[in-house]
Amino acid sequence: MVREKVTVSTRTLQWKCVESKADNKRLYYGRFILSPLMKGQADTIGISMRRALLGEIEGTCITRAKSEKIPHEYSTLVGIQESVHDILMNLKEIVLRSNLYGTCDASICVRGPGYVTAQDIILPPYVEVVDNTQHIASLTEPIELCIGLQIERNRGYLIKTPNNNSKDGSYPIDAVFMPVRNANHSIHSYGNGNDKQEILFLEIWTNGSLTPKEALHEASRNLIDLFIPFLHTEEENLHLANNQHMVPLPPFTFHDKLDKLRKNKKKRALKSIFIDQSELPPRIYNCLKRSNIYTLLDLLNNSQEDLMKIEHFRIKDVKQILGILEKNFSINLGKKPKMGFESLAQLIDSKSG
């Protein structure tokens, strides 16, 4: 455990980690201060930071398990001490750390007798187990246990739909994509009268997939991303001189869909429309955001080739973006999008290969 003496700056706003400890591999604690703040500022920052820590940070979980030998979720298997339901609950508790976008596959294939733990999960290189000792199942006989797993990175909660008699032996698992287990803030006031100031104390507990300091940094970045749109003045966006940045939105074929948006008779101030208003899936939104694409204008200033060059971007992501443009901004794409991307053939082949 590391604990430092709290010293307060009288000039520049500063933050500092004053205490940190790891109770075990799946429980980290950190205590931070931010000062000096004017009266009321500590509560403003503390409330928003706590919500961002608990709700805006992505985590990685096992969301589905598949085995053809399982008749239903509440069955028991010969040679395995736990029921299928117990195994699924144990898989739900596995803590993972990753740089994953979207979903990926993993597997378990173990022969008994013996214990099956998290270290037996066969993972892609960009996913790792935080605690290899986490228990999954106990094999009491020389049988083989093989389970296919789906791993997903997301935020918030994923509640499974009832699926007790899956025909293909695939069972969804409730997921809690929350690396931060708890977060609290408290305020210490000092000074008198008009010189009264505040110190904000933030306490963060994580599950080990992120350290408290990493969680604090990520929550701060997410809050900044949410507030960036307010840095663009409304008049600047809506009253552009000489129709600058006005982009036409006509009907067009899929082959030229992004390039020809600028030729529509219906013009809009696209610089004022942000991509987070467009119901984009989190994976696509995060890919665009990491490529500095924040507004619809930014999006339309990129060609199909540019979008396909974005890391982890796929041809179906481009199609999904176009579907959302059609739905939300009255862009008529015709009956069925065409697949003729001659200029993108090499890029698509290289991504699929």
UniProtKB/Swiss-Prot annotation:
Residues 1-234 are annotated as: Alpha N-terminal domain (alpha-NTD). It catalyses: RNA(n) + a ribonucleoside 5'-triphosphate = RNA(n+1) + diphosphate. Keywords: Chloroplast, DNA-directed RNA polymerase, Nucleotidyltransferase, Plastid, Transcription, Transferase. The keyword Nucleotidyltransferase applies. It is found in: Plastid, Chloroplast. GO terms for cellular component: chloroplast; DNA-directed RNA polymerase complex; mitochondrion. GO terms for molecular function: DNA binding; DNA-directed RNA polymerase activity; protein dimerization activity. SMART domains: RPOLD (SM00662). Its main location: plastid. It is an enzyme of class 2 (transferase). The keyword rRNA-binding does not apply. DNA-dependent RNA polymerase catalyzes the transcription of DNA into RNA using the four ribonucleoside triphosphates as substrates. The N-terminal domain is essential for RNAP assembly and basal transcription, whereas the C-terminal domain is involved in interaction with transcriptional regulators and with upstream promoter elements. In plastids the minimal PEP RNA polymerase catalytic core is composed of four subunits: alpha, beta, beta', and beta''. When a (nuclear-encoded) sigma factor is associated with the core the holoenzyme is formed, which can initiate transcription. This is DNA-directed RNA polymerase subunit alpha. It comes from Daucus carota. The gene is rpoA.
